[in-house]
Amino acid sequence: MSFWFYTNKDKQTIAILAEVNNTFGERHCYFLKKPDLAPIAWGETLQAQKIFHVSPFCDVAGKYLFRFGSFNGQHIARIEYHHDGPLLITSISGSEKSIALGQLFWSALRYPAMSIGVILRIHWQALKLWIKGVKFYSKPNPPTMRVSE
């Protein structure tokens, strides 16, 4: 998951593009904003209807609630998935860092190994859910639009 922040001339966040990739190599973006493009306050909840298949253990239904925060260079994104009540709550956090060309090179070399680790952890969690008997949803066709609001 990646987030792209759009700011106005006063450097206030007015929209956020939430880019979601699934394990099938597909991508969908949720364009998060207030109806009038008013500045988004840290901690404010933004909502998007779920229209993209991410997990075979969650139907393509319901909604996402997003909240973002930042303090002293630490950033956090909280994502809640609701369908007939809350089903999943997760967060992603990170910090700002300056990066030199050499660091960028080494990061690029480490990235494939990190991707393999993420895929292995995803499949391990899926196996545990399958063993528990959690309902399985077949993969539908991806949405026709690449970005939804």
Predicted regions and their residues:
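Mature, function-bearing regions of proteins
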Residues: 1-149
